[in-house]
């Protein structure tokens, strides 16, 4: 199997370069990859340390660096080593500048911008934590999105991912033979999404969870008929109310959240023209 080394160099958290790399790597199933993360590279001394690592471990370099001198040093070094050096957002910034007629700012301000978006994200994260697993149902009216589904269908991580995108998401578990909150009988403005999964896959996940917690008494938790019934009931609840249902059997959390956001914004645009 071909091995590919990728160096992710950033003057910030390296997440932008990491997302770009992972998106590209998803197109290659036969590549074994090794990613080296080099965050907070903001001066020549730190960059030189990274360059020595790149020299010892040749590979593609993906970078997001605002400082012009640091960029020049990095690209020149990679050129001499004859290895690719790619600016993740450089092309985007250039096209924005050309299209808008606004010059690119030469100086980089490393102080994070504490704007409304930042505080909306913090509030959404706090909301997701406080309204996890059916907690504080009386405050559902404050949410943007409500996720329902059987236990271990990725409701919690999906809620957190949505929160990082500024959306307040509550999640409520569906448990076999347990009464579901009466909010489903009311007309609500929030987007409600049901999450289901292949029963066999869900049993595997639940068994792994029980083994991790060293629990071997909860047989109904991994009983196929009960697990299957839980997924069927969630579909039934959603179908009766025209709520969307997402099968997460083969989806990553990011994919599930992205699909939910698409539904949410399509719905928002439809009713708020």
UniProtKB/Swiss-Prot annotation:
Name of this chain's protein: Putative pyruvate, phosphate dikinase regulatory protein
- In short, the EC number is 2.7.11.32, 2.7.4.27
Q: Which InterPro entries match?
A: Kinase-pyrophosphorylase, P-loop_NTPase, PPDK_reg
Taxonomic superkingdom: Bacteria
Annotated organism of origin: Rickettsia prowazekii (strain Madrid E)
**Stored NCBIfam families:** PRK05339.1
Q: Which UniProt keywords apply?
A: Kinase, Nucleotide-binding, Serine/threonine-protein kinase, Transferase
Q: Say yes or no: keyword Kinase present.
A: yes
What residues bind ADP, as annotated?
149-156
Q: Which reaction does it catalyse?
A: N(tele)-phospho-L-histidyl/L-threonyl-[pyruvate, phosphate dikinase] + ADP = N(tele)-phospho-L-histidyl/O-phospho-L-threonyl-[pyruvate, phosphate dikinase] + AMP + H(+); N(tele)-phospho-L-histidyl/O-phospho-L-threonyl-[pyruvate, phosphate dikinase] + phosphate + H(+) = N(tele)-phospho-L-histidyl/L-threonyl-[pyruvate, phosphate dikinase] + diphosphate
Question: Which ranges of the sequence are coiled-coil?
Answer: none
Which Pfam families did the record assign? Kinase-PPPase
Molecular function (GO) terms for this protein are: ADP binding; ATP binding; phosphotransferase activity, phosphate group as acceptor; protein serine/threonine kinase activity
Family membership noted in the UniProt record: Belongs to the pyruvate, phosphate/water dikinase regulatory protein family. PDRP subfamily.
Explain the purpose of this protein.
Bifunctional serine/threonine kinase and phosphorylase involved in the regulation of the pyruvate, phosphate dikinase (PPDK) by catalyzing its phosphorylation/dephosphorylation.
Q: In its keyword annotation, does this UniProt entry include Nucleotide-binding?
A: yes
């Amino acid at each position: 199997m071909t091995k590919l080394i990728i160096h992710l160099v950033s003057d910030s958290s390296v997440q932008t370069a990491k997302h770009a790399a992972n998106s590209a790597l998803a197109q290659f199933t036969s590549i074994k990859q090794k990613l080296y993360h080099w965050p907070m590279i903001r001066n020549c001394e730190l960059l030189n340390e990274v360059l020595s690592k790149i020299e010892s471990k040749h590979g593609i370099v993906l970078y997001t660096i605002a400082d012009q001198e640091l960029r020049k040093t990095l690209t020149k070094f990679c050129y001499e080593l004859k290895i690719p050096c790619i600016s993740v957002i450089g092309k985007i910034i250039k096209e924005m500048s050309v299209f808008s007629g606004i010059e690119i700012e030469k100086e980089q301000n490393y102080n994070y911008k504490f704007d409304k978006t930042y505080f909306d994200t913090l509030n959404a994260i706090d909301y997701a934590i406080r309204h996890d697993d059916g907690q504080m149902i009386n405050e559902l009216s404050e949410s943007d999105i409500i996720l329902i589904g059987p236990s271990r269908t990725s409701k919690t991580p999906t809620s957190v991912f949505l929160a990082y995108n500024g959306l307040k998401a509550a999640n409520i578990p569906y448990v076999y033979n347990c009464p579901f909150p009466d909010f489903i009988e009311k007309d609500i403005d929030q987007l409600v999404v049901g999450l289901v999964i292949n029963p066999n896959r869900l049993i595997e996940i639940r068994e792994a969870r029980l083994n991790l917690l060293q629990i071997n008494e909860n047989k109904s938790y991994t009983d196929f008929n009960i697990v299957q019934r839980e997924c069927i009931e969630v579909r039934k609840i959603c179908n009766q109310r025209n709520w969307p249902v997402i099968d997460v059997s083969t989806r990553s959390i990011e994919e599930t959240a992205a699909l939910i956001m698409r539904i949410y914004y399509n719905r928002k645009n439809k009713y708020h023209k």
